Amino acid sequence: MKEKIQELFEYRKIPYLLSFVKKKERKWLVKNLIQLQKDIYELDSYLETKWNLKTKKLDKYWSKINRTLSKLGYSPEESYKLTSHVRKYQLHETQLRERKMPSRLSKEYYYYYKSCDVRLTRAIISDYTDNGKYSCDITDWRFFDLISEINDDIEDIFEDQVTINGNLFNILIHEVGLEEASKQIYTVLNEFYDASNDRYRMTKNGDKLNIMKWTSEYYFDTVELLRKNSKAIRNKPFDDKAGLYHYLSSD
């Protein structure tokens, strides 16, 4: 799992943000951020593998998350506020069991909350950052994170079709078919790409220019991945009663 977390951090440019943290605090901070991400992944795994969720089990996962946040110096009240978007993400996942699909929501809204774990990491790093050296805030990463989350859905489409997962691309394929699903994802990718360019078009800030450059790179990578995986699905259509849809069809 540590390797998976390190790959996530690399992909989301977490090492770049950590470079603005005082060197003496960096190793300790990274260790605890990895543990926090592990705690969240364990919660996520429970949500993806168990249809009937138990409050006591959920409480156990949240106790681990809060314990790690305590090690990072946050009070229970601060931890509750920091993790509000993780709880919203959990709500979206649990609502699948009530047939409340994420396709009913704005794609920007849904993917924003889906990026809760990475935004939590950014918020914590920000609290340890020398603000005199770094001139961006968390909101500057918005479109980078939105495109990255779409990339994650497309990348994981084959494994997510057999789990209880709120992969929006997978859900759209089941609801409207592959061609329309691909079209909708491509459209929203373009919207996020254009919004990112509009936000930074006139900036001369080096940190923001980096974010714009990375967002652009990830946009083109994701468009290509969408083309590639859509072709693979076209050649071998999904089982319409696998994973999430197995439970929905028998519920």
Go through each PLM region and give its residues.
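All-alpha helical catalytic cores of prenyl diphosphate-utilizing isoprenoid enzymes
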Residues: M1-Y16, R26-L33, Q37-D39, K54-Q161, ...
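Post-signal peptide N-terminal segment of secreted/secretory-pathway proteins
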Residues: V21-K23
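Active-site/pore-lining binding-face segments in mid-to-C-terminal subdomains
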Residues: S135-L209
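C-terminal structured domains
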Residues: N165, I171, D194-D198, M202, ...
